[in-house]
């Protein structure tokens, strides 16, 4: 569960390391984001020669959360950290690689480009 002011790690090679959630998108009463939701983030730390700089505001997709998701077969999947992938205005990822694994629920939510860039799909 991600809410405003949550610090998240970036799991792609866009140049950002840490971001902070500043808005959860999706309606007036949508205050908590879960796996596969799009949020607005502010870049808190980045590498010097990255595609994004510190202080920029962009959209991000949540790909891993500590608070897990329950699947239809009853299994529960959790991760060790809260991670996002940065998106451009067209909804495509900034980076060309995604580190770590992503859940297969992202394919159902029409993020097949991110699933294809990932190292492993759980």
UniProtKB/Swiss-Prot annotation:
SUPFAM superfamilies: Ribosomal protein L14. It comes from the Bacteria. GO terms for molecular function: large ribosomal subunit rRNA binding; structural constituent of ribosome. Keywords: Ribonucleoprotein, Ribosomal protein, RNA-binding, rRNA-binding. The keyword Ribosomal protein applies. PROSITE patterns: RIBOSOMAL_L14 (PS00049). GO terms for biological process: translation. The keyword Hydrolase does not apply. Pfam families: Ribosomal_L14 (PF00238). GO terms for cellular component: cytosolic large ribosomal subunit. Belongs to the universal ribosomal protein uL14 family. Binds to 23S rRNA. Forms part of two intersubunit bridges in the 70S ribosome. NCBIfam families: rplN_bact. Part of the 50S ribosomal subunit. Forms a cluster with proteins L3 and L19. In the 70S ribosome, L14 and L19 interact and together make contacts with the 16S rRNA in bridges B5 and B8. This is Large ribosomal subunit protein uL14. It comes from Orientia tsutsugamushi (strain Ikeda) (Rickettsia tsutsugamushi). The lineage of its organism: Bacteria, Pseudomonadati, Pseudomonadota, Alphaproteobacteria, Rickettsiales. The gene is rplN.
């Amino acid at each position: 569960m991600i809410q405003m002011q949550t610090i998240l790690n970036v799991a792609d090679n866009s140049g950002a390391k840490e971001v902070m959630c500043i808005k959860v998108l999706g309606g007036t009463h949508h205050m908590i984001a879960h796996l596969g939701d799009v949020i607005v983030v502010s870049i808190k730390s980045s590498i010097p020669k990255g595609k994004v700089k510190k202080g920029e505001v962009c959209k991000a997709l949540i790909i891993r959360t500590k608070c897990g998701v329950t699947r239809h077969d009853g299994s529960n999947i959790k991760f060790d950290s809260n991670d996002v992938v940065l998106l451009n205005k067209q909804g495509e990822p900034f980076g060309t690689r995604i580190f770590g694994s992503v859940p297969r629920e992202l394919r159902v939510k029409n993020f097949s480009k991110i699933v294809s860039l990932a190292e492993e799909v759980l």
